[in-house]
Amino acid sequence: MSCHVLERLEEVIRQRIREGNPQSYTYRLYSSGLHNVARKVGEEAVETAVAALAEGEERLVQEAADLLYHLLVLLAAKGLALADVCKELERRMK
C-alpha cells in the first residue's frame, strides 16, 4: 500500500497557509512562528514515543499521524517539502 495521502496532506497544508484563514489550525500554527512549530513537533514526537511504550496500537497510530502532520507543517515553514525528505531517504538507501 502506498502512502500518497502524505502528498495530499502536504498540498492541503500549503493551501491553508496560502489562504491565510485565521480559523484554520494549520494557518494559526504556521503563523505562530518556526519556534512554536518546532516545539509542537517535539511534543508530538514525545507523545508518539509514550504511546509506543505505554498505550495500544490504535493510540500509537493516532499519535504517529499527528507527528507526521506537524512535521509537514515544519517542513513548509522552512520552505521544504516531503519530496526533499524522500530524496534524502533514497540517497541513503543506495
From Swiss-Prot:
Is Transcription set as a keyword in this record?
A: no
Q: Which GO terms describe its cellular component?
A: cytoplasm
Pathway(s) served: Amino-acid biosynthesis; L-histidine biosynthesis; L-histidine from 5-phospho-alpha-D-ribose 1-diphosphate: step 2/9
Where does it localize?
A: Cytoplasm
Record-linked InterPro entries = HisE, PRib-ATP_PPHydrolase-like
Tell me which Gene3D superfamilies the record gives: MazG-like
Q: What is its main location?
A: cytoplasm
Q: Which domain of life is it from?
A: Archaea
- Enzyme class, one word? hydrolase
Keyword Amino-acid biosynthesis applies: yes
HAMAP family per record: HisE (MF_01020)
Q: What is this protein called?
A: Phosphoribosyl-ATP pyrophosphatase
